[in-house]
Regions:
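Flexible loop and strand-edge segments within Gram-negative outer membrane beta-barrel domains
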Residues: 23, 199, 230-303, 330-347, ...
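Periplasmic N-terminal accessory/gating domains of Gram-negative outer-membrane beta-barrel systems
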Residues: 48-103, 107-140, 157
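Transmembrane beta-barrel wall of Gram-negative outer-membrane proteins
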Residues: 171-198, 208-243, 251-275, 312-320, ...
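Surface-exposed extracellular loop regions of Gram-negative outer-membrane beta-barrel proteins
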Residues: 283, 330-335, 378-390, 414, ...
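Outer membrane beta-barrel strand-and-loop segments of large Gram-negative receptors
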Residues: 303-309, 351-355, 450-456, 462, ...
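Signature of Gram-negative outer-membrane beta-barrel scaffolds
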Residues: 326-421, 432-433, 548-551
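Gram-negative outer-membrane beta-barrel transporters
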Residues: 483-486, 507-594
Length: 686
């Protein structure tokens, strides 16, 4: 198989490169939650018992180079060890060999699906809305369920109870505003953000793209009420939508709408109760017009959840927490329309859990964070779809079924000295919402399927061990962790099948086993004019599914053998700061044809193995400079950036075609999204 690179961007997004089109940035000191970067951050990491947990320093992430001028939480955490982004054109992140769909992403208790805009260029997280963020990539704490890879727990920033704040940012492609402050002083506050792109305006300037639609918006809002000290009631809301289309040819639309209510109350100094109710609706939609026939694929994922938990402080060194949760899931796995024909498949499931967790320290040096989660998932009846007879699809056999699991989880820490410790952990987890993406398409869509009497719950067992240390002044800290994870009931499409093949997903997927193992290293500099870190991950992820690859183990599509990240921030003066990041990762596994042949005038390819080849490695350098001017009434900031500074064309899509120079040959063609992209934005903060 011969390869060549086509150094051009995809048709729509190449216009953005030509126009140097960039959206927004924001003042680092006030956007992602102000945190003073000192040695205390290293001490907090060292003190944590939980293995594989990252309490994200949002102020530091805000100073990293921004893609298209936009600070991005998800792209920033992709610089952490054991985490890597899905790549250009995809906005998810993958943790320790898991896929992006195996992560639980929550905002104030609201579950978010596919949290990205414009095929991953931006994430759903508006940087000036987020107040806190924690990533759990090791054994997940017992209070979380529904994820076998990681949990990203975030929360919207509360409005100030005493003073008003506001900011506005304008870039070439998007603008955003933020406002917060008291409604009732010392009792009730609000915080709201809004962001809207105007890519369409630039596309209208180019005649060949006037029929193209590309825009997104998102809004967040939060009310924070404190009736008395220690108690609070929070009401949160988020909504976002993407629209990408070429009129009369194709269209892709997706978005999240969610809301939550959280009530926390204290009873004395040792007892805390928390009640959270939330709702999410995620709705992707794809439409095409081919050969005079309109085709449409729509989905939705809706969940309603209620959680009650209680925390008991037994002593200064011992804490107990218990809780229960109930979640109702309703999924339209697919609704397909082919001209006048229509078929759909809707499923429902009910998941109930109870958990207990304990954190404690013994003999000053030994700490434990342990717990167990009991989970009962009930398969509920589905709505039979209207069959498209020409496809001869069998009617699925909907049968109620119950799945029960016991999921123990534990993390242990032993302090060798005050500056060095070792950790170990073990955890079981399960997932009943399956998202399966075709490896043959780069669209940001998955086919969703609930656990049924045919599709079994995904199960994961993870083991971890690590070492961490720091200098006495907190200037430097470092860590090393190793992990091994095994999975059961991992699903992939049958050979020759894609997400569009049939509505009944059970008939086009197969289940099997997976395993992932690796080593992670991290070194940080926390104090001084120059701060930053370097992280490296050596890992392997493999899958074995009967009926695929002759039942042999093969590299998973998200396997990355080597993953290296460097990030640095240099404070040049009180007004100027410089930052840069560089990433390198091994190429993505790829299924390539071994033989081609003609059948009735059509070229067909024969594939002997799944993911037997790899795309070229991915590497990129990003740079930025920020100038801030404090003022009497408001502060201003100019941000300048260069994405992909040495113009590396990383693979976005690789497909195969006949080699015109050799009729019997085949060549691989690579397409890339972005070359060198400059950015500029202006922010004003009251």
């Amino acid at each position: 198989v011969r390869t060549r690179s086509i150094i051009t961007a995809a048709s729509i997004l190449s216009t953005l490169n030509v126009l140097s089109a960039e959206p927004t940035d924001t003042i680092a000191a006030g956007s992602l939650g102000e945190v003073t970067v000192t040695g205390s951050a290293a001490r907090q990491r060292l003190a944590s018992t939980q293995i594989g947990a990252e309490q994200l320093e949002l102020s530091r992430l805000a100073r990293l180079p921004a893609m298209f001028g936009e600070n991005d939480l998800i792209r920033s955490i992709s610089l952490m060890p054991g985490v890597h982004g899905e790549g250009d054109g995809a906005g998810g992140f993958e943790v320790r060999g898991g896929t992006s769909s195996q992560n639980l992403v929550r905002l104030d208790g609201i579950t978010l699906y596919n949290p990205s805009h414009v095929m991953g260029i931006f994430s759903t997280f508006n940087d000036n809305a987020v107040g806190r963020a924690t990533l759990y990539k090791g054994p997940i704490p017992s209070e979380y369920g529904g994820a076998t890879a990681s949990v990203l727990e975030t929360s919207l920033a509360n409005g100030d109870l005493e003073k008003y704040d506001a900011s506005a940012t304008i870039g070439i492609l998007a603008a955003k505003v933020m406002a917060s402050g008291p409604v009732v002083k010392d009792r009730l506050s609000f915080a709201a953000t809004a962001r809207r792109s105007y890519v369409d305006a630039f596309l209208q300037m180019v005649p060949q793209y006037r029929s193209t639609v590309m825009n997104f918006y998102d809004v967040t809002a939060k009310l924070h009420y404190t009736p008395r000290r220690g108690d609070h009631l929070d009401v949160s809301f988020i909504a976002g939508r993407d629209n990408m289309a070429i009129k009369r040819v194709m269209g892709m639309y997706w978005g999240n709408v969610g809301a939550s209510v959280d009530w926390l109350t204290r009873r004395g100094e040792r007892l805390v109760f928390a009640t959270t109710g939330s709702f999410t609706n995620y709705s992707p939609d794809m439409r095409m017009s081919m050969a005079g026939t309109d085709q449409k694929l729509t989905e939705y994922v809706r969940n309603f959840s209620l959680t009650e938990k209680v925390g008991i402080t037994l002593s200064d060194s011992h804490r107990l927490e218990a809780g229960l949760s109930s979640e109702l899931l309703r999924v339209k796995s697919a609704e397909m329309e082919y001209g006048d024909h229509r078929e759909l498949d809707i499923r429902s499931g009910w998941e109930n859990s109870v958990w207990v967790a304990y954190d404690g320290t013994f003999a000053e040096r030994f700490s434990v964070a342990s717990g167990v989660r009991l989970n009962l998932y009930s398969v509920m009846s589905g709505r039979p779809f209207r069959k498209f007879e020409a496809m001869a699809e069998p009617t699925p056999d909907y049968r109620p079924e119950n799945y029960f699991s016991v999921e123990p989880r534990i993390s242990l820490k032993y302090d060798i000295t005050q500056l060095h410790n070792i950790k170990a952990g073990f955890g079981l987890s399960s997932q009943n919402l399956h998202a399966i993406r075709s490896s043959s398409t780069s669209f940001p869509f998955d086919r969703y399927a609930l656990t049924s009497n045919v599709v079994k719950p995904e199960r994961a067992v993870q083991y971890g061990i690590g070492y961490a240390g720091m200098t006495a002044d907190g200037m430097f800290d470092w860590s090393a962790e190793g992990y091994y994870k095994s999975l059961r009931n991992v699903y992939d499409y049958q050979d020759g099948r894609t997400m569009f093949s049939q509505v009944n997903i059970e008939s086009i997927i197969l289940g099997g086993r997976g395993r992932s193992y690796g080593l992670e290293f991290m070194f940080r500099k926390n104090v001084g004019r120059l701060t930053g870190w370097i992280s490296y991950t050596l890992s392997r992820t493999r899958t074995r599914i009967p009926g695929i690859n002759d039942g042999r183990w093969y590299d998973a599509s998200n396997d990355r053998r080597h993953d290296l990240s460097l990030a640095a921030v240099f404070r040049l003066s009180d007004r100027w700061s410089l930052s840069g990041s560089w990433i390198f990762s091994s190429g993505q596994p790829l299924t390539a044809p071994d033989v081609k042949y003609e059948l009735d005038g059509t070229t067909c390819y024969y594939y002997s193995q799944r993911n037997g080849y790899r795309t070229p490695p991915v590497h990129r350098l990003d740079l930025s400079a920020t100038w801030t001017r404090p003022g009497r009434h408001f502060d201003t900031q100019w941000s300048f950036g260069i994405y992909n500074a040495y113009c590396r064309y990383n693979p976005y899509i690789v497909y195969f075609e006949d080699d015109p120079s050799k009729p019997s040959g085949t060549r691989a063609v690579q397409q890339s999204l972005f070359g060198l992209v400059p950015s500029i934005s202006y922010t004003i903060k009251l």
